[in-house]
């Protein structure tokens, strides 16, 4: 079943550290079945707290999504992301 990972950037705390995350996350995608659907496109919050940006990634199934998220390369990228911003990450299965 298709599975999606949704990331919302709640607050940037250190832009220089966050800038290092992008290349690391890109490298971590190699060898994984993921499709970016939304990458910081124009957005509008209709309910809830404001966000700075949204990323939505599509995976063929939950196992593939968690395999990428917990991979050594993305774990290192994620730790870098934590140095530069506060995010919310959600995994959700599609229909």
Where do the protein language model's features map onto the residues?
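C-terminal structural segments of small proteins and small subunits
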Residues: 62-90
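Short S/T/G/P-rich N-terminal loop/turn motif that feeds into the first structured element of a domain
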Residues: 1-53, 59-66, 70, 93-95
């Amino acid at each position: 079943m298709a599975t999606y990972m949704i990331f919302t950037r709640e607050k940037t705390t250190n832009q220089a550290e966050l800038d290092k995350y992008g290349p690391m996350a890109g490298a971590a995608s190699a060898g994984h079945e993921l499709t970016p659907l939304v990458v910081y496109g124009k957005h509008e919050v209709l309910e809830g707290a404001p966000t700075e940006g949204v990323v939505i990634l599509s995976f063929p199934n939950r196992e593939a999504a968690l395999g990428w998220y917990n991979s050594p390369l993305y774990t290192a990228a994620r730790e870098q992301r934590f140095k530069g911003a506060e995010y919310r990450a959600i995994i959700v299965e599609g229909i």
